[in-house]
Each structure stands twice: as C-alpha cells, then as structure tokens.
Amino acid sequence: MAASAEGCIFCKIVRREAPASFVREDAFTLAFMDIQPMNTGHVLVIPKAHAEYVEDLPAGSAGPILEAAKEVSRALRASGIRCEAVSLYLANGKEAGQEVFHTHMHVIPRWRGDGLGLRVRADRGRVADRKDLDNLAAKIRAAMGRSRK
C-alpha cells in the first residue's frame, strides 16, 4: 500500500485528527466537502475503513459508498447550490487520476458550460469489433477472483 491508514489524510479526517466540513456520516461512510473543489458543492464520499483501491474494499462495503453518493446527489439538487446535473467519479489508481490513495467517490455538481468534462480520444466514435469485445470479456472473466497483488 502506498499510504498506511496512519499517514492517510482521509483516515485522519475519519479520526477527527484533520479538519473537514462534514456533509453526512453513517457506520461505514463519511462525506465531506472537497478542499480543492472542481465546482462549488463538490463532495467526497469515503469508506471509513482504509482501502487504497476499490478492489481492496471488503466484500459488501462498496454499496454503502454509492448509497451515500446517491443521498448527497439528491441533496445537492435540492440545496440551492447551482446543480443541473451531478457527476459521480471514482479514480482507481494513479494513472486514472487518483491523488489520495484511500478509495473515494467525487460527487460533483454540474451545469451546462461549467468547463468540466471527460476528454475522449478522437477514435472514440468507432464501433468495436464484436470478436475483440468477446475476447476482452473472456480475459476479464478469467481474471475474476484473482487478487490484484
């Protein structure tokens, strides 16, 4: 693991050893305002237990993260904060954009023209070959259950 629970800023927030502006909390998750928001109202939802990557989460603990994000999303829309839509984003690894190595889901208020977006490759519009898709699906199925380590 790149960051131990001891040195992890999100774990420090869970233990109330670092400041945060809390939005919601339950037995498994904690939601708080992102200190470097992409848009006003940007919230992070984390599991209270340290897990660097989503695949490190114990069985059954990913669901509460999405449930918390769903509740935050609903509240953002009703809050009066500018929010025409909501992006849910989870970066899983450095190359995916993960900066804090404690699994977390971004709940980001969105509106037309906010300047945020997912950049896609120029060839994104092509339709993939079914045989290639079937081969990729088979590789992923074969890897199910194997550890990341």
List each model region and its residues.
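HIT superfamily nucleotide-processing domains
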Residues: 1-149
